[in-house]
């Protein structure tokens, strides 16, 4: 997934991750928007592949992790964990969520009650460990879980149905999980997105965020 953010007052737009320049340009053109910022979560090609092509058409500033600067295309501003920057007059908090990769960051927008997690925390899952350690991923998931429960989680991939099937093998008697799996399967049949999800849902149904529960430990 890539996500477009638009500020009606200023007319400015931002993009979180850039997998497919052609599709993103088509959406921007359809809406009559320009592109002012590109926020990158990590260096994997399916999150940065469209950056160079988009920059040929838009004067967009690229923002990404300082720790990943050597692997991010066209980086204009390098940000670090704990840093806050302004986007459309609202704060964006940078969170280190290493694990899937080293240097992976999430963007938390408290005023919008949204966090863009890409391949760290997903709907009922998390990204595979390519570079980080299990301890790093656990720390990252724990940090994200500490955000307000009504935060919307915008993750990077539509893996929810397979993640749900795995979660059921861990907690088959979790009523909240059973209900969510049914909803996910219904959406899959309709070819509807399951992203974003509420952080509350992840805490109630995702086993890795429920590791302190005796049933999950068993």
Spans of model-derived segments:
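Core dinuclear metal-dependent hydrolase active-site scaffold
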Residues: 4, 84-110, 114-115, 146
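Hydrophobic residues in well-ordered beta-strands that form the structural core
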Residues: 16, 62-64, 116-117, 155
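Conserved beta-strand hairpin/beta-sheet module of binuclear metal-dependent hydrolase folds
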Residues: 1-34, 106-118
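Divalent metal-coordination and catalytic microenvironments
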Residues: 5, 17, 42, 54, ...
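Accessory terminal helices/loops
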Residues: 139-152, 161-218
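Anionic-ligand binding patches
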Residues: 109, 117, 149-160
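Active-site HxH/HxHxD metal-binding segment of metal-dependent hydrolases
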Residues: 13, 20-96, 180-184
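Active-site metal-binding loops of divalent metal-dependent hydrolases
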Residues: 18-20, 43, 67-68, 100-101, ...
């Amino acid at each position: 997934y890539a996500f477009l953010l638009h500020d009606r007052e200023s007319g400015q737009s931002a993009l979180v991750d850039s997998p497919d320049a052609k599709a993103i340009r088509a959406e921007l053109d359809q809406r009559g928007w320009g592109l002012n910022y590109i926020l990158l979560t990590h260096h994997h090609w399916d999150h940065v592949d469209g950056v160079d092509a988009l920059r040929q058409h838009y004067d967009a500033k690229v923002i990404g992790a300082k720790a990943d600067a050597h692997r991010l295309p066209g980086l204009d501003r390098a940000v670090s964990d704990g840093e806050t920057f302004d986007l459309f007059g609202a704060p964006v908090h940078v969170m280190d969520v290493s694990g899937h990769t080293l240097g992976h960051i999430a963007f938390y927008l408290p005023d919008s009650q949204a966090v863009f997690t890409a391949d760290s925390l997903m709907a009922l899952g998390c990204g595979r460990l390519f570079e980080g350690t299990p301890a790093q991923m656990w720390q990252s998931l724990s940090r994200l879980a500490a955000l307000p429960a009504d935060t919307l989680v915008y993750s990077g991939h539509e893996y929810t149905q397979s993640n749900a099937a795995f979660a059921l093998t861990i907690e088959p008697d979790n009523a909240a999980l059973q209900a969510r799996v049914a909803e996910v399967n219904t959406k899959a049949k309709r070819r509807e997105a399951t992203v974003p999800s509420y952080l509350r849902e992840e805490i109630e149904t995702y086993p890795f965020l429920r590791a302190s529960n005796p049933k999950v430990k068993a």
